[in-house]
Amino acid sequence: MRVLVTGGTGYLGSTICRALTARGHAAVPFARSTGGDVRDRAALSRAAAGVDAIIHSAALVSVWRRRALDFDDINVGGLQNVLDVAREHQLRRVVYTSSFLAQAPAGRSTPLRANDYQRTKADALIVARRAADAGAPIVTIIPGVIFGPGLMSEGNLIGRMVADHLAGRLPGLVGPDKIWSFAWVENVADAHVDALEHGTPGAIIEAGGHNLPQRAPFEWLLQNRGTRLPRTLPYWAATVAGHLELTRARLTGGMPLLTPATVEIFRHDWPLRGGIGGTFEEQMAEMTR
């Protein structure tokens, strides 16, 4: 198949493009770095001419933006544009990249919606479900915390945290005992291609990995690289720091290192089903080579 990949030059998107090529498909990246913007429905429609399917991995992944509506325009409006274009061109399949943060954490029945990213990914999941109910050929993938080698972007949280720790720039961990689902980036990409080829329209597939404490990568570094464990930041101290960082960001236009909403996310466990591929130890070794 010829497949348009939104966000195709990003951390996950570029890995999806490679996975598509490896399976004999033709990947067509659509990304802002190459002149594509999911907010531009006309541009998206032009790019979709002649393709068989869309994998929609583009998203605004950030802890904060001065203009909160950017999250709505990209994360919710972008998905709606993809669905409209898929219907216009009568495409065979849409595979949508959601997020574990769009779902409820362990012990809750509703999504947390702590920050604008989480809020809009939860809203977009509702859009995806409604589209599926209306007959759209959409399959939704819900990855865990994606990690692995590659771009040090907002989407590569673990890679950035590990790099910061090794460089002495990581202040500490908030909620180190809380469970995350560490999902290897290549496995998540393969899950998208599986959904493209074999997924049932309307399905929501958890592409989880290893359900481990947040501190797990740093314990591996301690055992295999001899680094110290990061210190634990109490929730109250992290919340105060988050408020100070938000104030600084609003005054300077910079990006906060932490926000109170991020601290709230770190208070919860985020396990997923669907543990896929390889051992955590092997994956950490490859990521830190």
Predicted feature residues:
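NAD(P)H-binding glycine-rich loop region in Rossmannoid oxidoreductase-like domains
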Residues: 36-77, 81, 85, 102-107
